Every structure is written in C-alpha cells, then in structure tokens.
From Swiss-Prot:
Its main location: membrane. The chain crosses the membrane at residues 3-23, 30-50, 62-82, 100-120, 125-145. The keyword Translocase does not apply. Keywords: Membrane, Transmembrane, Transmembrane helix. It comes from the Eukaryota. It holds the Pfam family TMEM220. This is Transmembrane protein 220. GO terms for cellular component: membrane. The gene is TMEM220. The lineage of its organism: Eukaryota, Metazoa, Chordata, Craniata, Vertebrata. It is found in: Membrane. It is a multi-pass membrane protein.
C-alpha cells in the first residue's frame, strides 16, 4: 500500500508541476518559470517511476541545486512581500510565485530525504499526502474565488 501511495503522490505532483509549467507560457517571465516548474516535474516523475532514483548522484545533485535556488528566491520574495503587501499574499502575483517555490522546495526536500527509505515511513507518507493535496485544493479555491482573480494581471486571467 505505502509504495503505491508514494508513487501516486509523486505522479500527482509531477502532473501538478507540469501543469504549473504549462500555464506559465503567457507570463512575462515565462522562460524562467517554465524551467523552475519543469525541473521538479521531471525529478518527481522519475521518483514516481522508480523511487530508488533518489539515491542517484545526478538526481541528488540536480535536486540539491534546485532546492537551494528555490529557497534563496523564496526568501527574497518573502522579504519583498513582507514589506509591500497589505492584503492576502495570494492576491499578489509574487505571493503566488512564493507559494509555488515553497511547494517545489518542500516536495523536493521530501523526495530527497526518501533516498534512505525510498517508500518512506508513515510520517513521510502523511506529509506527502498533505503536500500533494495542497496545490490542487489551492487551485480550486483560487479558481472559485472570483474576487481574488479580479485583481490579477491579464496574463494570469487568460490561462486555464
């Protein structure tokens, strides 16, 4: 049960990251965000297909570099938002970017830590389920919340 659930979570997260990369195509800085989401999509897909891949030196190196990159960028965005935002951060494009970076970082750290036990323990699996559900529930909430979407720039309104 646990191996199948871990693989399913990785499959769903790979789909989420791929979809997130896809919806960036009309963003002013699309080339950056497509890469930021495509890297975890591929890394996560590989984990879903073969959980033992997290022990591979190339997988570990790429994931560690991406974790570092996303963490540094997230800290910068968080600082920016802390000083400039006066409403819900999800109303700001930078807030949505920050939440994407946090999801990427959390998921890749979870996968990275699974190299000792590719299927994960109960706690790791519970965390995986929560992280997997979060972006999908958030997207549904944002899609339903017309007030939140009304303040978005045009390029955010014309995607899925």
């Amino acid at each position: 049960m646990a191996p199948a659930l871990w693989r399913a979570c990785n499959g769903l997260m790979a789909a989420f990251f791929a979809l997130a990369a896809l919806v960036q195509v009309n963003d002013p800085d699309a080339e950056v965000w497509v890469v930021v989401y495509t890297i975890p999509a591929v890394l996560t897909l590989l984990v879903g297909l073969n959980p033992e891949v997290t022990g591979n030196v190339i997988w570990k190196s790429i994931s560690a570099i991406h974790i570092l990159f996303c963490t540094v960028w997230a800290v910068g965005l968080a600082s920016y938002l802390l000083h400039r935002t006066q409403q819900n951060i999800l109303h700001e494009e930078e807030g949505r970017e920050l939440s994407g970076l946090v999801i990427i970082t959390a998921w890749i750290i979870l996968c990275h830590s699974s190299s000792k036990n590719p299927v994960g323990g109960r706690i790791q699996l519970a965390i995986a389920i929560v992280i997997t559900l979060f972006p999908f529930i958030s997207w549904v909430y944002i899609y339903i919340n017309k007030e939140m979407r009304s303040s978005w720039p045009t390029h955010c309104k014309t995607v899925i």
